[in-house]
């Protein structure tokens, strides 16, 4: 690879070129959109310079239009963004304390500035130490909030004045999280919680994850959890989980669907999550059923019954009677109960729904839409899906089988080629994550140079994940990294295969902010996302501000795209004050890499 720095804008565009690009842009705007543009994902393989179809011509014209619009604004683009005020240290767009639902309309009117870290912010400790010890200045939570609950003091210990230590065997849930997980395993019929993967449990949606102790234990069992909790101005469960290096994102389903397809998770877990399941015509429970795979489990734990008596019959009446009634209408069965924990299993037989009484909840007639914050539906989803495969029947072999690829409509040769591309690319990417490439005399790190620390990155995001093969490449190389695999809503919806592979991810519209707190990711990666977004007329300036918001200080950005778009991105990287270097892949294409690192900025 050739390392090259882009240090300025292009020469002034000639009048003829200006006119030509203007005509191309006008044609692009006037020609109706092709249906295929909203369903075809961007390719990982560098495209040919000769475009043989309308979709490619339209895409290139959109890039040319964006390029023209960008450079016609001149040197004003080079001005650095100011730092936001202290009041926005933990700013999350699209959310406020008065509305439970996500609303991004007012976020577009906010001042454009860089969200700075708090005054006492420190770089997080590397994994796995950072799982158990975090800096108090990195999260918006006070010691009083920790110590105000008697149960919390069992699992937390404050070290000196600036650290919080999470006990590895804590008192989060009754006798400890390990005992709690073992209890769930017993109700399923397993000998130990270590058998979760063998029982088909690879992915868990954890609703209201507390401080992430259950999720941390699942990670140790090679189970992938994802925590969701509503937005909180202080003491956020999501912020704490991410600070510990555990998968999490802001989310609730009070009135809208979660950004996951039907049949996404092997288990849904709710421990003291505060949800009243029998309101809104049971649509909250129906949303759990929608994202739960056939044969999957719903675990509900609540200690509220203690005040109403200690007998098993009293507990069952106070907690599960109404949920039991609803569960029968959606073909769930109560599989076990121990103490305050109840476990239901979703049917593995799709014929169950046709054998119910007429008074039962109906089956959805059409549930093939992309579930991006759509309103909740009063019907049962996913029953006609090709992905209706009970978790107990799923192949235990490593890798993705030909039959699974066929279900998802993916050609095996295309999938295998994508795997090889990312195996090779990751070797190059990882070696580039060093300040050496930003020196006055940049070079590719050699054998004599120190390699990047093995545990340098924990929280990673692939902003245009396609099949999730960057995630797979990281696992193959033994990196202790989890990846938030994001699939753009207007690209081909490949999130189902990502989740079916045991990874985590979400659908997202990159014209909007991502539902997370500031400084929560160590690395952001995107392949051809900028070209994809240019066809959507999204603001790349706002995208870079959002990337800066969610990226940790000293975190990394790796972008792969066409040369023209990468040049624009390099200029925007300077505006958000990142160190940046453009790298020539030297494969004969116009593809380039942009490698950036965010500095620790403070006022």
Swiss-Prot record:
GO CC annotations on file: endoplasmic reticulum membrane; plant-type vacuole
Domain of life: Eukaryota
A Pfam family hit: Methyltransf_29
Positions annotated as glycosylated: 96, 393
Residues that span the membrane, as ranges: 13-33
Alphabetical UniProt keywords: Endoplasmic reticulum, Glycoprotein, Membrane, Methyltransferase, Signal-anchor, Transferase, Transmembrane, Transmembrane helix
Its membrane topology: Single-pass type II membrane protein
Family: Belongs to the methyltransferase superfamily.
Protein name in the entry: Probable methyltransferase PMT4
Provenance organism: Arabidopsis thaliana (Mouse-ear cress)
